[in-house]
Amino acid sequence: MTTLTGKTVLLTGASRGLGVYIARALAKEQATVVCVSRSQSGLAQTCNAVKAAGGKAIAIPFDVRNTSQLSALVQQAQDIVGPIDVLINNAGIEINGTFANYSLAEIQSIFNTNLLAAMELTRLLLPSMMERGSGRIVNIASLAGKKGVAFNSVYSASKAGLIMWTDAMRQELVGTGVNISVVCPGYVSQTGMTVDTRVSAPKLAGISTPKSVANAVVKAIKNKTTEVIVNQNPITESLTKLMLAVGQISPTSVDRIYRWFGVVDFNQKRAENRVKDGYVAVESHRS
């Protein structure tokens, strides 16, 4: 799929954060974007942005945490636009905290949004893609899924699951004409975790722009890229890959690097702020 012109894309988490930037990037490629999110007002704004950028947009308000109802979402989308060429699983939720303080409902909410919704949407759309011998699936994960992050353990686990599932599916789909990719951004400016003005994201760890992440998604679709690390610039990305490789040999060495970068302190402060806020869920860069 060297071009997205005339292709139909189903994008979850489209109402804010990264979702808006991804939708705009797709619009510039002349794609039709089926925008899915819980926020009807946010979807309207995203659809307007898509149309302004030269694309076509359809809004479908839906909470992807309701995984048992996702078949209705897929049917509604296909009734409106026909076959889906590209699925982008971007919806995500993040709740910082010490693990002992998580409720089962919070854990289930994170996994339903970050992992199970992606699996179920893929399961529902994959047969038609395989029948046509063409399709793209892009999962938006996180560097937190490549290296566990203290005080964000459930989010890390959900994203690690997304990465490993993508890896397994990539092997399973060889020869089908359907390709699956995973994009792993680090901290992203102007979105989710970085908008808490009470604590600044650790600059030493690298901070990317949402536009750069959106561009990486488009490139992954066009180039069939297996895995994309997005972290500020090519040099920082190369160092990140090296650090992750070292972590496979000596995990505690990278633990110390994370503490030195300020990653652990950052997440601990966000967890403390969550307690002060009365345990309100802090959604990540897409919802």
From Swiss-Prot:
Q: Does the keyword Oxidoreductase apply?
A: yes
Q: Which InterPro entries match?
A: NAD(P)-bd_dom_sf, Sc_DH/Rdtase_CS, SDR_fam
Which keywords annotate this record? Heterocyst, Oxidoreductase
Spell out the coiled coil positions from the record.
Answer: none
* Alphabetical list of Pfam families matching this protein: adh_short
Give an example GO cellular component term for this record: membrane
Q: Which GO terms describe its molecular function?
A: oxidoreductase activity
Disulfide bond residue pairs: none
EC number, UniProt record = 1.3.1.-
Oxidoreductase: present as a keyword of the record?
yes
The signal sequence is none
Q: What class of enzyme is it?
A: oxidoreductase
Biological process terms in GO annotation: heterocyst development
Q: Which residues form the active site?
A: 155
Chain sites annotated for binding substrate: 142
The UniProt record gives the binding positions of NAD(+) as 11-35
What is this protein's function? May be involved in repressing heterocyst differentiation and may be essential for preventing all vegetative cells from differentiating.
Which protein family is it in?
Belongs to the short-chain dehydrogenases/reductases (SDR) family.
Q: What protein name is recorded for this chain?
A: Ketoacyl reductase HetN
> Which species does the entry assign this protein to?
Nostoc sp. (strain PCC 7120 / SAG 25.82 / UTEX 2576)
